[in-house]
Amino acid sequence: QQEKLYHLGAKRIARSTLARINEEQPASLYQQLFSQLLQHFENAKGTHKFRFKNPLYSLDASHIDLSLSLCEWAKVHKSKASIKLTVGLNHSNTIPEFVALGDGIENDMVQGRTLKFPSGSIVVFDKGYIDYQWFAEMTQQNISFVTRLRPKTVYEVKSVHKVLACKGILADEYIELSSEHAKKRGAPKLLRRIEFYDVQKRRTFEFLSNNFHLAASTIAAIYKDRWKVELFFKAIKQNLKLKSFLGRSRNAIQTQIWIALIAYLLVSFAKHMAQEGWSVQRLLRIIQVNLFERKTLKALFSPDKIPIKQKEAQMSFLL
């Protein structure tokens, strides 16, 4: 790429220069830019694969590893340092619609409960986000949740419902959490327990939800669809330079993370416009390889649809 920088009339930018910019420029600037871009992309929402129309989100967090010797402020324990990225991923367009950055040592719930999901939405998350008081708050706000039931959870079965064993459903029960801890935290009066056998994994799963309208098989399928948020974390870590950082301070690290999220947002929008069925990971790799090429995004993402220009007569020999 060095020759192309030369032909552009651009000089090589020193790593120290970029690091200084990341140190001095407030991370909140890039956070606001991400939020503004997100508003522009509201009309680009697609649809998730389920029949219901409710917005579906996956809530999850992932550690972004840092150097303990360079980032002492991010210390988790004596041999690890990290910052935690929490997202609420919209399943309709695989865009992180809700984002929070916190210390790696924090419990997942610290940032998780700060995300304000819209009324009527469905949120799916793992057992790291079990908080009975939060469950009650979501129920009051008309937000449905789907999660795993923790082992040894104390509950009382209030009613049992018919199940379709052919779809892997072993039990569909309405339950009341009866432990002292659940009562103290103000858990919802009634919840739904679904027992599901996964043929592929040969495992039985127990799900907990406050949604009493969807089919039990749909509840199980919603939790299985949570893998999309894991693909999101994999994509940004592998393709958007979140393994090495320019700068050591909290501000510099957060700045680079927000820039990576902005890049992911732009590529996701380009993916929606291209409508080629390509993954965000593939589009990111194409952009990296062609970063200094004189091509439009349309030409990169839909090369077969761009007509080949005929040679000009002036540049041809008459034979």
Question: Where is each model-derived feature located?
Answer:
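DNA-recognition alpha helix
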Residues: 1-8
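Pyridoxal 5′-phosphate
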Residues: 13
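Primarily marks folded extracellular/lumenal domains of secretory and cell-surface proteins
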Residues: 38-45
